[in-house]
């Protein structure tokens, strides 16, 4: 035990291992959810939302509910704008903390028992947190752009002679695909916020990073997973 503690304290092994497990858990979870959604769309809340958005687009375009479309897209755009602004403000806060790294080394690593005080890792932790926030910002900004494109596309009416049903279905599918892309980018931005929580706990020590990663992934699974009764209902409908 003494030998193991000396090995850990004399290197960055514990920090590197916990960060590797953090990346593996988050990226593995996202791949797992994506794989399950492709095989069974009603397995996750995201899959059900994609189906609902496609149905909503078809209904709006067929019945000409332009006001409803504008109001709904405006709400989605405002939410994405607020979160994008939040990501930028948090990034500015991280940049401010980078100039006070000496104080953070003393106040944030209070429990030395769970990991050695590697002061050289503090800038790297801040950079990783900053990259995570910028990624979330770009995803939210991309979703805003896509929501704006959908606003133009969903109100466009084909006025040519070819008014066949197949032409209308194709148009609805194109708009629904664009709207689902906006929803996916919004979801990835939220994933960036969720993955930020373990990174903040990393400042207290690598064990806190690992524990927070397990907790956040567990919570995300319960939030993303469709309940059995709801899954059976959507399968029947």
Feature locations, PLM:
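Membrane-interface amphipathic/juxtamembrane segments adjacent to transmembrane helices
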Residues: 33-73
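Transmembrane alpha-helical segments and their cytosolic interface motifs
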Residues: 69-95, 183-210
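Juxtamembrane membrane-interface segments at transmembrane alpha-helix termini
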Residues: 162, 221-233
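Hydrophobic alpha-helical transmembrane segments
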Residues: 9-20, 113-129, 206-211
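Solvent-exposed, non-transmembrane helices and loops of integral membrane proteins
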Residues: 56-67, 152-183
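Hydrophobic alpha-helical membrane-embedded segments
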Residues: 15-43, 81-96, 126-149
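Membrane-spanning helices that line or support transport/gating and their immediate boundary helices
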Residues: 31, 35-40, 149, 153, ...
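Juxtamembrane "helix exit" motif at the C-terminal ends of alpha-helical transmembrane segments
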Residues: 2-6, 88-115, 202-210, 216-221
């Amino acid at each position: 035990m003494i030998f193991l503690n000396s090995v850990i304290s004399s290197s960055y092994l514990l920090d590197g291992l916990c960060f590797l497990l953090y990346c593996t858990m988050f990226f593995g979870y996202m791949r797992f959810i994506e794989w399950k959604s492709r095989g069974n769309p009603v397995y996750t809340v995201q899959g059900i939302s994609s189906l609902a958005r496609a149905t909503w687009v078809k209904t709006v375009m067929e019945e000409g509910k332009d006001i409803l479309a504008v109001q709904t897209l405006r709400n989605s755009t405002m939410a994405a704008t607020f979160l994008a602004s939040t990501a930028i403000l948090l990034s500015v806060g991280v940049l401010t903390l980078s100039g006070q790294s000496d104080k953070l080394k003393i106040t944030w690593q209070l429990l030395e028992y769970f990991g050695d005080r590697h002061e050289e890792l503090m800038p790297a932790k801040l950079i990783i947190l900053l990259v995570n926030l910028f990624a979330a910002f770009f995803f939210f900004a991309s979703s805003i752009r896509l929501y704006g494109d959908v606003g133009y596309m969903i109100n466009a009416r084909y006025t040519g002679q070819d008014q066949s049903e197949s032409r209308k279905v194709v148009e609805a599918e194109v708009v629904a695909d664009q709207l689902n892309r906006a929803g996916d980018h919004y979801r990835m931005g939220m994933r960036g916020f969720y993955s930020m929580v373990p990174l903040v706990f990393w400042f207290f020590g690598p064990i806190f990073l690992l524990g927070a990663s397990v907790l956040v992934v567990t919570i995300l699974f319960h939030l993303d997973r469709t309940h059995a009764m709801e899954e059976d209902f959507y399968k029947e409908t």
